[in-house]
Swiss-Prot record:
GO terms for molecular function: RNA binding; structural molecule activity. The N-terminal arginine-rich stretch does not seem to be the major RNA-binding region that allows formation of an infectious ribonucleoprotein complex. Residues 1-28 are annotated as: Disordered. This is Capsid protein. It is found in: Virion. Keywords: Acetylation, Capsid protein, Ribonucleoprotein, RNA-binding, T=3 icosahedral capsid protein, Viral nucleoprotein, Virion. Its main location: virion. Residues 11-21 have a biased composition (Basic residues).
Amino acid sequence: MDKSESTSVGRNRRRRPRRGSRSAPSSADANFRVLSQQLSRLNKTLAAGRPTINHPTFVGSERCRPGYTFTSITLKPPKIDRGSYYGKRLLLPDSVTEYDKKLVSRIQIRVNPLRKFDSTVWVTVRKVPASSDLSVAAISAMFADGASPVLVYQYAASGVQANNKLLYDLLAMRADIGDMRKYAVLVYSKDDALETDELVLHVDIEHQRIPTSGVLPV
């Protein structure tokens, strides 16, 4: 065997461990892919039950009270000038108001900022007289009297402020579905004009079960 053949054989011998070393990562990669797929399936399963801002559950992941369900309505405020106010009475569907004596336990407002939202808003819910025209002056006075909790919602770089819900408890008031027309959601645009494509409010009204609500989520 000449010198060149000896050198070639030596190189081949040195390469064998390298070929073996390449097979080990392939096996590890396969195991990693299997594990990744399992984790992905687990995340999807968990995400399906994880509450988000749009998830149709009352008060995040909390269930309704026994014997209760909820009806949701969506409000989209019109343009509100800087320092001005907006009010909208709670108008439930006829299929719900038909059972006007069913008790209401609580109202929750969930603030859903849209892509263009860059403002600061104050949100509350109040019982207002039937004679009230929800004028700017009337709404301003209701924000100032401190008689109702107020949610201050500000722009967040993440897209959703950590606290985006306001809960209004009505158990002690013995309010019923028929009373809901006496309540209104009020919005104050503090620092900037609120445009029509910046904000949506989801209002969840928890009330005693009615025959037509059997298919609603609880």
